[in-house]
Amino acid sequence: MSGDEAAPVVVPPPVAEPAAIPEDMDLMTALELTLRKARAYGGVVRGLHECAKLIEKRVAQLVVLAEDCNQPDYVKLVKALCADHEVRLLTVPSAKTLGEWAGLCKIDSEGNARKVVGCSCLVVKDFGEETTALSIVNKHIASQ
């Protein structure tokens, strides 16, 4: 090793800026982004039994229910628990959509969801960090 050799210069890779979230996005897009963020923080619970336990413990911050749930008793139970414990409730049209948002699917190499399993009920116990999508969801819930 001679003194003529220069130390290699390490250049950090460019950091990709997160995609800007438009202020005028619709509720379903905002809910999808909110659930994705909450899932990354481990704050999403799926299934009727686990959701009912969290609602009764008053840990649930938001409950998302599929409108096309094939068990009317599930819908009645979740709505009653939310009303009784004053938990915010949102509904989505499809259980398959909710299952995809909850992570009950396989993601192929192109980033598309496949083998999606339906999800009738989902509870968010931790939203993670505050985002624009979360504020849109909160505004919608407050206006109900």
From Swiss-Prot:
Keywords: Acetylation, Ribonucleoprotein, Ribosomal protein. PROSITE patterns: RIBOSOMAL_S12E. Disulfide bonds: none annotated. GO terms for cellular component: cytosolic ribosome; cytosolic small ribosomal subunit; nucleus. GO terms for biological process: translation. The modification N-acetylserine is found at S2. It comes from the Eukaryota. It holds the Pfam family Ribosomal_L7Ae. InterPro entries: Ribosomal_eL30-like_sf, Ribosomal_eL8/eL30/eS12/Gad45, Ribosomal_eS12, Ribosomal_eS12_CS. One of its GO terms (molecular function) is structural constituent of ribosome. Belongs to the eukaryotic ribosomal protein eS12 family. This is Small ribosomal subunit protein eS12z. It comes from Arabidopsis thaliana. The lineage of its organism: Eukaryota, Viridiplantae, Streptophyta, Embryophyta, Tracheophyta. The gene is RPS12A.
